[in-house]
Amino acid sequence: MFRLKTLPLLIFLHTQLANAFPVPEHLEEKNIKTAENYLRKFYNLPSNQFRSSRNATMVAEKLKEMQRFFSLAETGKLDAATMGIMEMPRCGVPDSGDFLLTPGSPKWTHTNLTYRIINHTPQLSRAEVKTAIEKAFHVWSVASPLTFTEILQGEADINIAFVSRDHGDNSPFDGPNGILAHAFQPGQGIGGDAHFDSEETWTQDSKNYNLFLVAAHEFGHSLGLSHSTDPGALMYPNYAYREPSTYSLPQDDINGIQTIYGPSDNPIQPTGPSTPKACDPHLRFDATTTLRGEIYFFKDKYFWRRHPQLRTVDLNFISLFWPFLPNGLQAAYEDFDRDLVFLFKGRQYWALSGYDLQQGYPRDISNYGFPRSVQAIDAAVSYNGKTYFFINNQCWRYDNQRRSMDPGYPKSIPSMFPGVNCRVDAVFLQDSFFLFFSGPQYFAFNFVSHRVTRVARSNLWLNCS
């Protein structure tokens, strides 16, 4: 029988934990416990290391392993970014080491697999559960030679059940908003089975946890896939909402399933979206903005967030932070006086206060005074009571106080910003500079000396050397 590894429960005094974890003294005991449990469940932290003189070193190494997996700064310390990842809802399968008690990399020896829905969640109708499960299997059948057939009785290859807490497989669930589900790799008995926490709120949309998305991830494990370090992959361990109606299996997952089972039987092989690479020399941003000291770089359905104090950069789905925003944002800027961030796509724009959407949005850019001939904004930045909008090779200037366009605009970009002789993809303000991004380059324009003082690669902002 195939089972997830589970480790004995560790019980320690607060002082012992504080010594074992290289963290600030003021860190709450709750955070230490969370980190301890996380490393045990997902990174195979053994209990006896806490009882030895090398415990602090072992914990630091496990923290670094976890930080490496999630592309965080490998500090070996329980910093804010690390704690943030640990608190995200996720899959219950470990990221490190085998989660089976059998050696090797099991796979199904037949391609016509069967599945059975043992029970249902009361939050969705039986038909809704059936549809979500079918769609989740379809994601994998399109990319591989595998087929999936539901059976209503008898022994299936993959059994699907909604269960809670301790449910007899040595991998108990933890209640709402923690571990969402888990699954077992191919094999007899429990092998291939997928369990969903019945205490979670399962939905068909962006609220709470979308059953289709979680099921598709878990079925990847049922077929033999492990977790991916690619934050855009379906097999990434943390939950992130993506629009189900337009969902396409990412290329990383296609590569993974075809490595195990070979290509699809279809004459035309499927291709999927790839996660943008920070150090791609051809990388160009869709939009950039600051937000209360942080810098955001948007690309397709993702954004990089740069922390000025930590000097770290992390990649996230737009939908993870703002499920109401579209992918492919085209412009953004921060209004420092109003403490708002405005984001644009096509003729629509949204306003955020921190991470919260303001009421009454989206609105049409005609509110700024743009004519119907303007169908999209390339970039925007606000400075000294004025907001500059960049559209093709022109710049429009908006008076934030009067809430109208300044007369005499638009003007050509080079006439206003000598040295910026290109279309502007994105821009933000830092110190006495406008940072203009065009293709894979950025131009640092000093608005005091009124000239470009530096031209360099855009991805230097993502810590690429």
Curated annotation (Swiss-Prot):
Activity regulation summary: Cannot be activated without removal of the activation peptide. Activated by matrilysin.
**Gene Ontology biological process:** cellular response to lipopolysaccharide; collagen catabolic process; endodermal cell differentiation; positive regulation of microglial cell activation; positive regulation of neuroinflammatory response; positive regulation of tumor necrosis factor production; positive regulation of tumor necrosis factor-mediated signaling pathway; proteolysis
The entry's protein name is Neutrophil collagenase
Which keywords are on file for this protein? Calcium, Collagen degradation, Disulfide bond, Extracellular matrix, Glycoprotein, Hydrolase, Metal-binding, Metalloprotease, Protease, Repeat, Secreted, Signal, Zinc, Zymogen
Q: Which family does it belong to?
A: Belongs to the peptidase M10A family.
Q: What does this protein do?
A: Can degrade fibrillar type I, II, and III collagens. May play a role in the degradation of collagen fibers during uterine involution.
Q: Which Gene3D superfamilies match?
A: Collagenase (Catalytic Domain) (3.40.390.10), Hemopexin-like domain (2.110.10.10)
**Organism per entry:** Mus musculus
Q: Which residues are glycosylated?
A: 55, 112
